[in-house]
Amino acid sequence: MSCSGSLSTCTLDSGDLYYSFESDLPYSAWFFFKTMNVSGAEAVIAAASPFIGQGESACLVKPYVDVMTDSEIHLAMTSGFSTIAGSVLLAYISLGVPAQNLITSSVMSIPASIAISKMRFPETEEPITRGRVVVDRGEHGPDAPANALHAFSQGAVFGLIVAGLILANLLTILSLIAAINGLLTWVGQGFSINHLTLELIIGYIFYPVTFFLGVPRGEILRVARLLATKLVANEFSAYLSLQAIMQSDNPLSYRAWVITQYALCGFANLGSVGIQIGVLGAMAPSKASTISRVAFSAMICGFIT
């Protein structure tokens, strides 16, 4: 994720006069609203995710997060997992990934994430934003800021709360992963299996997935391990590993390289589960149980897209 936490949040809150993206966003959201038959809040979050990232896109409909249906929350999380944010684009470009591939992958993931999320978690309730596209960060409510300075202060306080929740959830999940890897390594030593970890196991599980992606047969296992690195660690670590492979004496073929670039693009990893739970949980405390319940399902859906 973009771990821009406090800064991104307070920037969104203080930008009601200066944030020009808001004026263009409804047009993009309207397209998905009309073509994908989703609620206005879902359309806004999905359309904004490739630009401002997971979690932060929900700030654009902040007053409605607390009254979202379970299906809407699932879609909001899925769209965040399936894309990257503009704030990390340059970092991936510096690793040798062409910008057009990253942007294309993120944009294509918007309708894909909507479709997969709705197949996995169909809407059974009536969303409050059904029939209208709405962009509302809460600047016109009873707690509306008096001026830009007040808005920045409110955003900073909220961002601090979000950052604390992100840190707590992220440390919990990363600690759990480390504990599982330690247990697997200990068990593996008893069976003479060196370095048995989640990444290794998931890499073999992803072998058929990588095959269906169209990767040449001789390179399937290497690409599958990169996908496992993305899921267990994060996409940045996976792109670093991809860069190392491409600079080695045995690089991937051009076809496998391009497919891998697209497959690794997105925030779908175990660490991001903690981030999204923290961000959305701060905006909608009453939905904390729902957010935690659908988080892993949304991550898998986001990974698929």
Regions found by a protein language model. Give the residues of each.
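Long, contiguous bundles of hydrophobic transmembrane helices that form the permeation core
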Residues: 107-110, 114-160
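Hydrophobic core segments of alpha-helical transmembrane domains in multi-pass membrane transport
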Residues: 5-14, 82-91, 106-120, 169-182, ...
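Hydrophobic alpha-helical hairpins/lids featuring a short glycine-rich hinge
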Residues: 1-38
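Membrane-lumen (extracellular) interface motif
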Residues: 88-108, 187-194
